[in-house]
Amino acid sequence: ETDEKRRKRERRNAEKKAEALLAQADKMRAKATKAVAAQNMARRAERLLAGVEGERVTDQVAKIRFPDPAPCGKTPLRARGLSKSYGSLEVFTDVDLAIDKGSQVVVLGLNGAGKTTLLRILAGLEPPDTGEVKPGHGLRLGYYAQEHETLDVSRTVLENMQTAAVELNETDTRKILGSFLFTGDDVDKPARVLSGGEKTRLALAMLVVSAANVLLLDEPTNNLDPASRAEVLHAINTYAGAVVLVTHDEGAVHALDPERVLLLPDGSEDLWNEDYADLVSLA
């Protein structure tokens, strides 16, 4: 048995065990008395998957290219007067943002300033306390969530892609998944057993088939090996649609070459200049 075959066998075994543990944990969570045991089972599953996460052939790189965005109006997304608090904790107040066709905006702020919350509100996944988000003519929104909550972990890789690529047949969907290194039986795995890097690639693949004209990207280079990160940076750099980016990665900001910066929590806007680059890694 070659090393590669052995690694594949070990990975399959680990995934089966992890899937069984996660299924059992889901059942136990329904009972309050077993909540701690369920949490421990989920952690065991995570450790199993972490042990085999780096076993893919390193010379394979996901081919990431965003297609031309769908046609849209001059300002496909606009937000006015957004505020958000959690209990007595005020996250941000009175944020205005107009995303014009093809514009590039980077959102900066210290941890806890509400960057992820703002993207979730813009994506329609969380309501603001005050203010409103107004979609413009032809808006087609793509959202990349750093915690991968846009993935349905109960569905397979292929099923997740099919929800994003309703206009594609299964053969074409499988081809695109193959370009993101999901081949053969990989497409039949439940998303819940994927490693962090695999979830990132699947979420990016779903963005690619969406033909979005506005991308909301929350830490899109996390969990990627250097070669795949370079592919993501190139895809961002060549994308013709509008982008709102949250990142700690200076390389991602330089790839975007933003026109504007939005500073949280006060919601002030400025034209981008390199003086802001020092804030990226601190954000």
Please identify what each model-predicted range represents:
Residues 2-94, 98-101, 283:
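Coupling and communication elements adjacent to P-loop NTPase active sites across diverse families
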Residues 1-5, 66-283:
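ABC ATP-binding cassette signature C-motif
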